[in-house]
Amino acid sequence: MTLPRPFVFALACLLLLAACASQPPLPSSPPPLARALVYQVERQTAEGSDALLLAIQPEGAALRFSLFDPLGVPQARQQLIDGAWHADGLLPPNPRARTFFSVLLFALTPTDQLPGAYAAGDWQRAADGSRTLKDWQVRYPATDRLELQAPDGSSYHLALLPESAP
């Protein structure tokens, strides 16, 4: 049985749209970073927990995100250039890391810049200072710490390393 070509095209478009809709939105402009930030990251998933190191480097109008395992082996490298993610280096695509980076951009955006950076229906701010982006929860337990809770139950606990603190 052969499906009609318009049906196949429509189905492909719907699948592509569904894949795009599941990604957290990117800001209209990235948060301003005066210098590189380095975080110790603890990722907890149903499979277990991982220790990671994350470096975020401003490079002109772009931001470079580099995620490493404890041995220094790169796990993900992406650049945010002109509002879109671009591969940085020869690593294979890492959709989980790209989603994490997108939510982290939201977490790092100053509160007063959120209305201009994100569509009103995409985010909320609670009285306790926590935020929600789509189905992700962002909490700020201390000035140098972030907690991100994913819709699937996994979580990321980030601690800013002292050398990179503003």
What are these regions (language model features)?
Residues L14, A19-R35:
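Bacterial Sec signal peptide processing site at the extreme N-terminus
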Residues A36-V73:
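Post-signal-peptide N-terminal segment of Sec-exported extracytoplasmic proteins
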Residues A76-G83:
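Short Gly/aromatic-enriched secondary-structure transition segments
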Residues M1-L11:
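Bacterial N-terminal signal peptides that target proteins for export
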Residues A55-Q57, Q79, R139-Y140:
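Well-ordered beta-strand positions
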